[in-house]
Amino acid sequence: MFENFREKLQTVQQDFTSGIKTLSDKSKEAKVKKKQRRDEYLPQYSAGVELLSRYEDTWVALHKRAKESAKSGETVDGEVVMLCAHWEKRRGAVLELQEQLQQIPTFLSDLETITSRIAHLEADFEEMESRLVYLEDLCAQCEHQRFKQFQILQLENYKKKKRKELESCKAELDAEHAQKVLEMEHAQQVKLKERRKYFEEAFQQDMEQYLSTGYLQITDRRDPLGSMSSMEVNVDLLEQMDLTDVSDHEALDVFLSSVGEESSAVSPDAGGPSLEPGSSPSDISLKVPSQSELRHNISSISSSCTDTVSGTTEGPDEEESSSGDSPLVQSDEEEVHADTALMGLPETEALKSSDDSDTQAP
């Protein structure tokens, strides 16, 4: 459109220049004709002046209009140039916009591809996050297992240490206990030997007195022998024993009356059992009527003494518990049970054998 306008302006300018040329040519021709007419006819100066002034006025008006048209043409040309530059810029923008509009489908396809890739990346990121969480869990489990193994190792070492200490302490305690047991057994053996010796001597004295006089005399208290304090207490308890029948008191009276009758029948000079005038109420004497009854009474007395000795050797606790009550002596009619606490000891067997030999000696 602007090119057409420019072409029109150029054609107008050419037409204007051609018109001016034609006018100049016509004026030249008119001058030539005037000269010819001047020659032919007489000049008319007033008409020429009028024409000249008129042509001069028209040429001035034309020249002024030409200048004005030239200025307007230059102004229009500048504006046309500016419009051309502006529209060239707009045309470039439009072309760029057209190219961009043509690239919109490609952009949309690329955008869809990027969106799908972003979705895949999001899924990959989620999977990676889950893997990282699982890895953290595995690391925590490994750390826990490592700490657990370390604690188990420390516990095993502590158990081994304490087991060794326990074994060493147990060995020391076992050795100390064995030493104490040996010492206690040795002391018990010594004490049993001393008691056996003491009771054997006391029994031998009682047997000698009984065999020589025919009476068994029990006093309130005897003099202590040596430094055997524990045995003195036991002997004092034995000496303070009262002849009491557990089952029936009448059996003892019957036994004493029968023994008195038989002793009076066999030895009338000796007399029945009675208290001596100088003896205390606690001194009890029994007279043997015959040799067979004497042996029978000796065996029963030896068995009761053996039971008493075994009862006194059972321990200091039983001695203290029995010291509060009055000691009891079983009658000859009851069955005598031997103490099983000292049956395994050779000293008790030797004591029984010595008692049997003493009872069979008369």
UniProtKB/Swiss-Prot annotation:
GO BP term, example: regulation of signal transduction
Keyword Aminoacyl-tRNA synthetase applies: no
Stretches for region Disordered: 263-362
Major subcellular location class: cytoplasm
Alphabetical UniProt keywords: Coiled coil, Cytoplasm, Cytoplasmic vesicle, Endoplasmic reticulum, Endosome, Membrane, Nucleus, Synapse
Coiled-coil spans in chain: 109-180
Location(s), subcellular: Cytoplasm; Cytoplasmic vesicle membrane; Cytoplasmic vesicle, Secretory vesicle, Synaptic vesicle membrane; Endosome membrane
A Pfam family per the record: Dysbindin
Record bears the keyword Magnesium: no
Membrane topology field: Peripheral membrane protein
Biased composition regions of type Low complexity, renumbered to the chain: 271-282, 298-314
GO cellular component: axon cytoplasm; BLOC-1 complex; endoplasmic reticulum; endosome membrane; melanosome membrane; neuron projection; nucleus; plasma membrane
Family designation: Belongs to the dysbindin family.
PANTHER family, per the entry: DYSBINDIN, DYSTROBREVIN BINDING PROTEIN 1 DYSBINDIN
Annotated function: Component of the BLOC-1 complex, a complex that is required for normal biogenesis of lysosome-related organelles (LRO), such as platelet dense granules and melanosomes. Plays a role in intracellular vesicle trafficking. Plays a role in synaptic vesicle trafficking and in neurotransmitter release. May be required for normal dopamine homeostasis in the cerebral cortex, hippocampus, and hypothalamus. Plays a role in the regulation of cell surface exposure of DRD2. Contributes to the regulation of dopamine signaling. May play a role in actin cytoskeleton reorganization and neurite outgrowth.
Subunit structure: Component of the biogenesis of lysosome-related organelles complex 1 (BLOC-1).
Name of the protein described by the UniProt record: Dysbindin-A
Species this protein is from: Danio rerio (Zebrafish)
Lineage of producing organism: Eukaryota, Metazoa, Chordata, Craniata, Vertebrata
Protein's gene: dtnbp1a
